[in-house]
Amino acid sequence: MIRKVLYFALLCFFGICVVPHDVFAYIEKEFAVVRIMDKAAGKTQVVTIPLNQNTQIDGLILNARNCKQSDPFDAENFFVFLEIYTKSDGRIFSGWMNRNEPGQNPLQNDAYDVWLEKCE
């Protein structure tokens, strides 16, 4: 019986006091700043999108669901969960974008390219 109590006490102590080293902290932000390239018009623009609101820019409708910044003590990075629609094709993108690795998961289609710049 005493062994079980000691074992339980040790588990509780180490379970509470030991913190994994891989803990990531993120700062939730209110806006996503994205760069949009309109290939047909040959222009790029930087647009600030509020979270959870449909924002229409040219032929695109963008909705940023979540935007976060990495811990300020780590290398600065930003992540956004973005949904992009066109009136003709419906949803053309839904997923996470990573600012430090723009080639990992950007929107690249015939008419537009979209990249994350930062979160504010």
Regions found by a protein language model. Name each.
Residues 9-17:
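Bacterial N-terminal signal peptides
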Residues 2-4, 21-120:
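N- and C-terminal low-complexity/disordered segments
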